[in-house]
Amino acid sequence: MLTLNSVNHGTTKRDKNRFCGPAVISALTGITTAEAARRIREHTGRRQITGTWGDEIKPVFADLGVQMTPARIDGNGYLISDLLIEMLDVKAQRRHQADQRGSGMTFAAWLKATERERSGNQVFLLSSGHHWVLVQRDNFVCGKTGEVVSVDHPKVKRRARVSGIWLMNQINDQQAAA
């Protein structure tokens, strides 16, 4: 079972990456943000990690035993799996995300619409206000908070627009073998 943890910036300056992509990987898996950034660089070939896309952090989560599944909310607030986005190529997916910016529901509206879905232990990864955040029940963590806080905490940007939602699940041995 996945649980939210504080962001692990390590003990030295070399261990620290202050950006949100490595921070959410760290908060969910426990590795340092520097290690998360190194793994993202391995998958992307980029020299430095200062911003990430969903397709850049997904393989890192997979390497660490976490499955990132796209999800959407229908008009009634129910989560529905979004296989269409999964089938789009990377450029089309990025264009789709860029087109969605400025539209869609706010983080506060998403919280209200998903009260029932958030009552269990499901972890959600959201792209909210061009920033990665993790939510489990009424707990929230991101690179800005650094630690697990309530969704009502002042550092939580409730008016930010949600542009992407993913369900985070632990990969069991049978899924990994397939």
Feature locations, PLM:
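Low-complexity, compositionally biased segments
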Residues: 11, 23, 85, 92, ...
